[in-house]
């Protein structure tokens, strides 16, 4: 999965759940800028966040 796909999936899941980038950043303990970069494909989330994201978004 490429960066764009990861970002689109993350963005879509966040919108379905009805939360902001700021709210997700608080859950994960990262900056809002990090969430934005993940969603825009500029960066990947560290692999350690994937299990947390999976649990959070079910």
Regions found by a protein language model. Give the residues of each.
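A short, Lys/Arg-rich alpha-helix, primarily the initiator
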Residues: 1-16
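Residue-level signal for the short linker/turn that defines the boundary of a DNA-recognition helix
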Residues: 8, 18-19, 45-48
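Short alpha-helical DNA-recognition segment
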Residues: 18-37, 52
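Short, conserved catalytic or interaction motifs in soluble domains
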Residues: 40
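DNA major-groove recognition helix of helix-turn-helix/homeodomain DNA-binding modules
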Residues: 48-58
